[in-house]
Amino acid sequence: MFYRHLQLNELTVTGVTGDTKLKHVTAPVSIVSPQVLRATASTNVIDAISHQPGVSQLTTGGSISKPIIRGLGYNRVVVMSEGVRQEGQQWGDEHGVEVDGNSVNSVEILKGPASLMYGSDAMAGVVILHQQPTLAEGEMKANVTSEYQTNNGLFAYHLQMAGNQNGFVWDASFSDKMAHAYKNKYDGYVPGSQFRERAGRLMLGVNKGWGHSRLVWAIYHLTPSIIEGERDPKTGELEPLSNDLKTYGRSLPFQQVKHYKLVWDNSLNLSSGYLKAIIGYQQNRRQEFEESPDEYETFFKLHTLTYDLRYVTNEFDGWKLSTGIGGMYQKSGNEGEEYLIPDYRLFDFGLYATATKQLGDRWMLNGGVRYDHRHLKAFPGFSMLNGQEDNFSRNFGAFTGSVGAVCNINEHFNLRMNLARGFRAPNLSELGSNGKHEGSLRYEIGDKGLKPEYSLQADLGLDFTSRYVSAQLALFANRIDNYVFLHHVGDYTEGTGYGYSVYAPTYPVYAYTQGDARLLGFEAGVDFHPIHSVHFSNAFSYVDAQQMHAAPGTKYLPFTPAPKWSSELKWELSHHSHPTIAHHHTTDAAHRSLLNNLYVAVGLDCLLKQSHIYGADDTETETPGYALLSLSAGTDLQLHGKKVAEFYFTADNLLDKAYQNHLSRLKYADENAVTGRRGVYNMGRNITFKVVIPITL
């Protein structure tokens, strides 16, 4: 949320030119602190940050979420974890982010293409997942976290142990999470919504005066069942896939996702600045089982090698410079009976240089330029439904840039301005898809002739801070040439290659197309704190996404988030320092108190009706508005002035409202013949209990 903006301004942002104070960043940035992450009830890390202004999630059930920033997602958002870009075949609706949420300490969200460090796919922005920082010299700590959610019986635990002895640092953790089917007022328990998640992480390294060198190994396993949404034609009830809808075991059909990551992170301190080099290897194995739990129909195996070399200078005469090169090599293959995309190889690289300049006490200027090149080659494997060859080769390249300024008008007002040019090469799914997606309930067809996307985005922000009120306004205008999107192409007609495939007769067919688009929107927030212990925070997000020069029914871009207003009244019942401040100063009274950092909060999330839809060929439908009431509380338990546990309680959808989010893929499942309602609804009332036990060794 937007509260306590003055203290938040002192935080350091890493996703721009080196490490920069938030108050000096010209582009829009949101930061999610460790305390907010721990206190937020969620099923995955993207779900946890989806409450941030301008951020949404595309969901398939309770376990799969994809980040959407200002109406843009998929390969337009780069997710960074362990210092490398997360590569998990993110082109699919039902392909989430393969990162253990318990391993994430804080999150940076960069909105728009202003940061030049991340390349082609960062047109919409970047989500940077920061893991726990290394401990100070001589420290050893452990951490035990346990969580339970009532709606889907989610049970999770997380074990972590870390230390720093004579500069040798380590951090080991293991997480396990399981959930049975979730329920709502209209559908009851939803068959196929159960999942199981396991993850492990090990970091070994050295921290010295010359810098650091760390090796990280991470593994992530997710087994979500697939919600098909099929109904009994007589009763309208969802057809159960097993006799026990509260089982934690998998049921057909289901996915099995395994993601492995090895990262070597190095930083060398120099007299003039520092040099950073990160090399990463990832393997993503994604299987779908439809008829038998022992025989997969689809099996994608993706190998990714990433590299990043960066040099950042110390500040001199108000200047700070950064330059670098980075890129990746990918090899993807199909090992299943069914194909969605052809085998392919990809190689890309990018060169960039950025600069910031402090002008007096009021102005901070920054700018930069980047060049990207990408080569992609698809190999023969199957015949494409639209008659195109399934083997092709494409090359893409472009220059991009950004320029911005921050003006500290006075002690109360801060003005931010930024203009950025973005670029994105079409991904392999957009160019070469030809198959049914069991998890997204459709058949998809690519177009190898698609052009790259180019964007021009302008941002204007104004921050106000006073003793009792803080407010922020962020405006943006984004023009995208050759915007790529999916649209429904109707029933099968012989010779056209579109509609219903003979190989998937029950699946509607969607084809990739493109057109020029413009997106306008804003995020606004205000926090009232008439007394120190009370905060009334409000945030509103809006984006209008239109296709230019389009016919009626195709005017609006498909799957644009609905306008969202979030409000929270929070009462802090005991003294504490703000969670984002590194050093906590505790009073004698706080040392004597059994409960510290005690708070109670009431929240309301209102999503307005989304009537701006791509209605041609029933690509999408309007979504009614709804409001969700929540209640939360939390506290630290202290004994003899030492924190021994943290407790969190959250009740989401307190009134058990039946609703469908506009970005839920389950909204387009089968219609209930009895009620006339289409699709599967989101989760009903859900109460979460979480306990965190820190242990100092």
Which residues are covered by each model-predicted region?
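A short linear hydrophobic-aromatic micro-motif
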Residues: 54-58
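Active-site-adjacent helical/loop segments in soluble small-molecule enzymes
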Residues: 49
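Gly/Thr-rich phosphate-binding loop signature of adenosyl cofactor/nucleotide-binding cores
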Residues: 651-653
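Extracellular beta-sheet/turn segments enriched in Thr/Pro/Gly and aliphatic residues
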Residues: 1-10
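Outer-membrane beta-barrel proteins, especially TonB-dependent receptors
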Residues: 5-6, 15-32, 36-40, 59-67, ...
